[in-house]
């Protein structure tokens, strides 16, 4: 069957519906998701972003080395209409500042290992900062929006 997907969001929602009970990915102990579970985690994160004023078409930074939750972060952004701003782990503090400032990013997913490289003045502007490692909230700013 041929599909004419126009967006990653369409692919995501189709896959969650069609393959719900199948494994989406497996990574070591405790990080195994069926498509259903993967979709649930992404929806919860998306709702968390919405609760902090991150709406469709808003930009969300993604600054993390490769890890299983990188894909969770990515799809919690793009599958619900937001725009991902991916950043290379080799970027300097000034480059991180420039990218997040010029993109007008309102939220950030960042690994705990790289968190200290994000300039404080940028962190203060973020509505919410989420760790890609365990998807915990590292910082939330109700007054940012």
PLM feature spans:
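Structural core segment of the AMP-binding/adenylate-forming
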Residues: 52, 79-145
């Amino acid at each position: 069957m041929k599909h004419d997907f126009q967006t990653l969001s369409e692919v995501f929602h189709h896959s969650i519906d069609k393959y719900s009970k199948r494994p989406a990915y497996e990574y070591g102990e405790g990080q195994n998701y069926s498509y259903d579970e993967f979709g649930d985690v992404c929806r919860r994160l998306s709702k968390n972003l919405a609760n902090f004023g991150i709406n469709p078409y808003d930009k969300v930074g993604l600054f993390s080395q490769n890890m299983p939750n990188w894909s969770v972060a990515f799809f919690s952004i793009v599958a619900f209409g937001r725009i991902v701003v991916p950043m290379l782990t080799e970027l300097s503090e000034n480059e991180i500042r420039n990218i997040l400032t010029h993109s007008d990013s309102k939220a950030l997913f960042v690994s705990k290992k790289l968190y200290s490289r994000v300039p404080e003045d940028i962190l203060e502007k973020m509505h919410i900062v989420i760790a890609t490692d365990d998807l915990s909230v590292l910082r939330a700013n109700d007054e940012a929006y």
